[in-house]
């Protein structure tokens, strides 16, 4: 029951139709108008929020949520397309207070804003292909960055979205970033089942594009020979769980982003052991504890310019939404790293 | 854990800000731009889909899905805000075939199209109040009706959305409709806990506005004295479950909409007994079976100009999404009534 | 994981102790003091509630909840011991309104009061045996009936409690009653696995004791040869589900209780098909719908002097507590039959 | 997560191996030895059980369970491969008594025996293809029928198994049977996604083979144009749910099997509404109630020579196994029809 | 669906009634009689159990369970009111043996006794306000302590109960105690949403009252600025999870209670990471492992005079009751610390 | 709902029958034929697989799965009888890749083969007693070991199966092995509730038989006085969780099997904390993390000649089958230790 089946079928409809009676030109004009309207909606919200923040004053950087409900580049389950609204709900849910662990006040509007979701399903349902869709994601990210002091904190969606997001961040800032990538998998395969935009290939695309200087992968415990070879080829620093007890000290005192445009943090919720985050598509036992992740994030030194939290799959969560709370706390603590 | 808590908090932010340093004018201009962009996005998708349908030809009326993910006017739980994407997923899910029970082919693009969701949460999060929000819903419905041969089939959301939807349908067609309303509750209270837009009051607003000639309520089994008095006041035909075995024959041979602008069908998923539809906010035992509902719908005579399926709450569904399948089949069978 | 395992073990402790060093007399005195204190607590609550009702005036009969959290006489699962607080929660839960289907206002304190639970586990844990425990249940019921205008509406617990409850009702009123008994099973076996107080034997005890004139059993679909023979022996009117479509008309126009002390209604939640009430210990497909039960109850003529709702097992309910809502609605509609 | 993925992958291993270094002959000899051993195991158990029954005497026909844990011919989910042990557990589970509704004693060994499962996964894992696998199923059924007075009552598995089972029954008895087929779907498509053994095609195979004279399909509510055309082509009597209220009387007084070799009953658990049987792969609302099914079965006149209960999917059942109990009760009541 | 909604509504009834026709005096007399009966029931059980223990001889201190099913002072969910019977069930459940990890035999009646629950809901339902209710809790604790060698081990309920319990312990012993408090939250706010008895304020009340000399808080990871300031104001030793890896050694070798009346241990189940204890109202990732908690408890030196296990919420537990088993093991290991 | 209830009842049937009319001889002959056929089926599959492996060449040792679906020797729940097919499904499930953590390729047929399940239930259902059944398990293991290069990796079933498995391994190899036993319980009681084949006694049987030289037990946290005494009596090295932080270093550098016939690894899934493996019969908080287990296994030096993974109970697993994935990963990583 893929989350985007409707879109998938419509693409066929649209193709069939256009093959039959509608000119390609007319179709593409229609699609472009839909895409433009989508970006306009994000732009107007970013503008409004940023104006308000600037009126308040005293903010240097402020985390701004942008949802990318895209699940169709997953190899196994497509539920992450449903994640953004569930994460937002959990962020503001009354079961916890409004402070982060180190004392940032989320109730202060200068700390966290939101520009809503890129209308991914609506665009796909108009027959727009993946190349162009990935560009829409990139454009959306840039639209947010356009508005000072907003910095994009992206809610996935599957991990395929990290490629267009990091590309946009790097292009907008004018150079590569350092990436801290927490994940059970390296997501660095050349292509997965022929899909170059697969959620298992995003970091191959990022490294090929030169959007990152250093790439540190932490939490890895499902990796093939090709995954290790690609890691070497791109100079990736892969920290596997097998040796985490030895690497822990180093990982709890990272310093990143100097000499480049800053730090990007990409958190795949499955970096956590499934005991801590059961609501993921790929259950891979032997992962990090939630505290392990916080220890790494809290102690990281560097200017965090953007980030993402991806691969939370609400269709696999417990009935009480434990993983939604986990994803939300990750977003909250990342917000504390970004906003200042 | 209300589905729209984020929005709720932001409204306060926005008010605080505007009270402090931002002029009301500037804020309203920003909100208007966001609303305009939202409507533009729906318009562009409706245009594109309708153009394609018209190019195909031979269609007199075609059901067009419009999601309204609004849950904050509910008195108990707000999960219906998450329903539209789950219903879409279930409509196209591979577990069933593409024919309706009476043989309509949903794979034929002339039968069913989709213009996506009204970005309710994004608009609320900009501080837009309910009056204006309800207008946005109405405008969205009219935008769809603008494009021949599209007819709106709205995915809720809670039942408060039926008011702006029916209002739009009636205003656009230029006169009242007949309404078949399947529900456990009459939703006709003057106001609920002071909220005139409450999901328990939508049909009071509809009747006051003169948007309906006849209103038939079927499945009723949770009704107070006020509910029965309001029913009498507005001339509502209330069929309570207590007497369903006697009313069944009449309800399985309805003829509606003659002399007015057509028939509107509003299906609250909780019209069904919770055995058949556990994923609802208000579990009220003693309801209709799914077959009872189909027998009423299949045998209804009349020109169905629009409809809605509301109050499915995915946060209360079974782990297999049984109620999502139920909501989806309701949408499929309503599509068969609308499209021709 | 029996709900009363703690009690079971303590009984052994107490026996061992008393065998060893404590005189039987001393032990029994202690037990008696505990039992007296238990009954005093119920009496004081009944008195206070009844005083308030009488001060209000105009009440002829008022349903009064009495919980009997006893599960250890069940043959399969003992979860019904946890039911009473869950049913109370569901009765007052904000998801439904305060009117019964026929218009009784539960918010009116004259309609429904509550004297809490018999402290079954506490008493058993002091080493009190079943004979004496059953007497405590009977005494508790009589204590409630002592206070005009209270009529006991008992929340089980398993079905073994109907014996001491009906016995108390009959003894207090001074003669037999007619019983409407809704159940998947006849519960009329001479003894089950040697336990004469078994939940499968309560109606054998009732008939032997002469506490009932007529006993109508409806919903029966799990019955052995012995069950049918016992039925004949005691003159029970057994309506099996196999012939329900033929018996329906008769059962929807019952007139009971004339010439005796009134009508007692005992509802085993498993009379319903498990589709409507999954939270029961004995899943027996092929039962009544919730509407079938309401049709029988609403149309019953007779003076209902007391009743019970038993065998709801919260440990088998859905995560949303659907069966708790079902049990609560049964209690609400029975309240409407009793109070006047 | 297909229930037979292991087998699927091994088939590839075996093919690759055999392509490489192992002669086809050697491989086929090995496979044949495995198949022979499998059939021997069933034969020995059938022999032992039948000997014991014959020693007891007085039995004319006795239902004998045969599990066929095959799920790989399903189009959507493959969980039915896990069903047979779960159904057995539920049949003997202590939560219900040992009598069927009409008084057959299942504790009497003359009424119900069991020869275990065909080792489907083990055989497939040796690289055996579907043609041959279907023959193994047929041979297993014949092996049971070989032993008087055993009559096969087959536990699926998906619906694809009905073809080899009915074929075996008909071939063994020397002529066609009449089939009562309860299902949401007609399963009569020529082939499904190219698979002629698909669970959606079994009854096309049966009718083509001449194994049935009359085929009555009851509960149908998901059927395409092709399904109806195939129905006509083969002279199938299709009773759709749309008209069930009209057909009910006729279906509750069926007389079948006269002039042919007897009656075969095939019950797809999804003939029931998902409210009554949520544990199925294809949730199709609007089905029969459990009582509807029992009314049809109890009133059927005819000599039932064999039957099956298929498509129960334990991976979609409720946590309490409600559908397992439903499947088990179907088996119990079918046993009562067969044994005499 | 608050666990005490019934009580809440009744309070209104009682107030309305008393306003109208019943004298305040009469009402208060009735309430007092109910409270007296409640305390008598606890006293009689404590007496009986203590007599038996003393007859056995050789016991210096013995843990005695006292349930306090109070959930209405919670800010978010009120399910902890249902916890005590579930914890008792799990303590004696057959899935584990009767020894604690360090070898205490729970089957020895000298090690663990039980005086049942304070009838919180029954008392509230009579219109008794929180001030008086808290006194009833205190009196119940003192009643247990009256009977040598019983020491109270309290089963919550929400954390608001720790205030009246500690107060009673301190008053009864005649001086302050040292408190080891395991929790995700400091529960030391001056008042929460205006409620001075809130479960978020209990330790503010305790410190103000001078009932504790040292207060050590371990597991803290959701704390606001006010929480830290209150901590300083009262001289609380707050150990936050952020620094747990550094504090671990110190916390695994605590020595408490010297020079005061002993040690009190208060365990909020949410001190554990939700992976280990999902059944809590406030899911706060990043907590202690179960082994972390045991290491702290096993190595603690001091005379433990009383304790509590609070905030287990059965309505959020897994279907198998994992958190019930966790709460039960906490009770078992605390029992081993107390009894000697 | 015991997993083998059917079998249990049949045993009674068979006994009754044989007592009555069938000679013991005839019955035993029938049983022997069934047992022979069962072993033949395993032998033929082992032969075929081993032939193929030998044809491929270059394999010294290859893990070969053998399922033993036996649950009736459990003291609490019997669900482990359903485990083998669920573990197989999870091993090959598409959610993870085919490499083990240290790079073994499971897609290489030389690394992992499968001979299916011992038909335990079928044999028991023929009235075969436990003594003989245990011999069948032993014979099955030897049958696998007969075929070079296969080494048995057994899928339980409850822990009682380790006794016949280890016995077979030791007898076949001609001497004792060293055993690494990961478990929450020592399983070394003389007998449990009179059952010498209990899952709580298997290691007592193994030590008595001299099948092991060293026995290391890791993860122990539920142990009685008898358990510790039996440990001493047999010279078992018991590592309790209470001291795991101190023992960790030693356990992460084990060297076993020198001077004996090799190493046997027995993994009871409940060695893990229930947070990591909720799907077990005995929830015992305070266990190992999944990474702890992998660290011990990865660093173990020794020739692993066979192993088992037992006590996974699918009836207690999460709806997503998290524990199935955990059991499968244990099997995968053990495969990597065995195959070379």
From Swiss-Prot, chains A, B, C, D, E, F:
Mn(2+) 1 binds at residues 159, 183, 187, 268. Catalyzes the hydrolysis of L-arginine to urea and L-ornithine. The latter can be utilized in the urea cycle or as a precursor for the synthesis of both polyamines and proline. GO terms for biological process: arginine catabolic process; putrescine biosynthetic process from arginine, via agmatine; urea cycle. Mn(2+) 2 binds at residues 183, 185, 268, 270. Coiled coil: none annotated. It is an enzyme of class 3 (hydrolase). It catalyses: L-arginine + H2O = urea + L-ornithine. It comes from the Eukaryota. Binds 2 manganese ions per subunit. It is found in: Mitochondrion. Residues 1-24 form a transit peptide. This is Arginase 1, mitochondrial. Keywords: Arginine metabolism, Hydrolase, Manganese, Metal-binding, Mitochondrion, Transit peptide. One of its GO terms (cellular component) is mitochondrion. Its main location: mitochondrion.
